[in-house]
């Protein structure tokens, strides 16, 4: 079910303003992240120690956008 807002990076983001969501990794730090691009190239990010946690959160966000 499509949501109107998602909570990300300690903020509520209107899903209509999200341009794209992507998975990223910082292999030097051993961290996995998610970037959310909000209209006008305003990036938000969350970082995780485990790839599985990042993937789970990514799927939650994608489900909220559908």
Q: Model-derived features: where do they sit?
A:
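Intrinsic disorder/low-complexity segments, especially N-terminal tails and targeting/processing regions
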Residues: 8, 20, 36-38, 63
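A short, exposed loop/beta-hairpin motif centered on an aromatic-Gly-Thr core
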Residues: 41-51
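A short, charged, amphipathic alpha-helix used as a generic interaction element across diverse proteins
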Residues: 50-66
